[in-house]
UniProtKB/Swiss-Prot annotation:
Residues 1-154, 180-207 are annotated as: Disordered. Residues 14-24, 75-97 have a biased composition (Basic and acidic residues). Belongs to the UPF0328 family. Residues 98-121, 133-149 have a biased composition (Polar residues). This is UPF0328 protein ECU02_1590/ECU04_0060/ECU08_2120.
């Protein structure tokens, strides 16, 4: 049985699509397309979304004014004022406070009498501490630099001559003990040495 062609018949005039003018306008106008057949955007949207030719970062801004540059802070602003006659500021002072003039008394030359120098040379030979004299102008509790040729803090060292003398005496005493024991007349010191060292070294026995 053939299908009726009712779906191809025109719509009656009382259909709701025919009643409204907006629906009739949409039905009559085809969609706007470009040459490729795709949907065309309205001109307002297309103008804003289309990229500009070239690098947009290198182009100067065409619309509006450039943002105002930040002003550098003037040096006169703030708490430090540089005027011709500035008021005395007790909190922030850039000038250093004057230091007490104490450096002059450290550089005053110290006069040392010749008698003291001769005594110091003799004391230095003996290994004794040297003598220093304080001038009466400088108080006793202040620091007083000493001249470079006087060394008052040298450590007490035994002179080389006395050290050699003690070494020679020690060697002589040992030789006397061994020679006395070899001749058969040991002294009291040799007896104690014999008890401490029953077997003396061979090189000392040959003496």
């Amino acid at each position: 049985m053939p299908r009726p062609a009712s779906h191809l018949a025109p719509m009656p005039s009382d259909h709701p699509d025919f009643r409204s003018e907006s629906s009739a306008r949409l039905r009559c106008q085809p969609p706007r397309t470009n040459n490729c057949g795709t949907f065309k955007q309205p001109p307002s949207v297309a103008a804003t979304s289309r990229p500009k030719p070239g690098n947009p970062f290198l182009q100067p801004p065409t619309k509006g004014t450039p943002p105002p540059k930040k002003k550098k802070k003037n040096h006169t602003e703030g708490c430090h004022t540089h005027e011709a006659n500035p008021e005395p500021n007790t909190k922030h002072t850039e000038t250093e406070s004057p230091k007490p003039q104490t450096s002059t008394q450290h550089h005053t030359p110290i006069t040392i009498p010749s008698s003291l120098l001769s005594q110091n040379t003799q004391r230095e030979k003996r290994g004794l501490p040297l003598l220093t004299s304080r001038p009466s102008t400088i108080p006793a509790n202040t620091y007083q630099p000493q001249s470079p040729h006087i060394h008052s803090h040298t450590p007490l060292q035994r002179p080389i001559s006395t050290a050699l003398l003690h070494q020679n005496l020690h060697i002589r005493a040992r030789n006397i003990r061994h020679t006395g024991r070899l001749h058969g007349s040991p002294t009291k010191g040799a007896q104690t040495a014999q008890q401490a060292q029953p077997h003396p070294p061979k090189q000392l026995a040959t003496l």
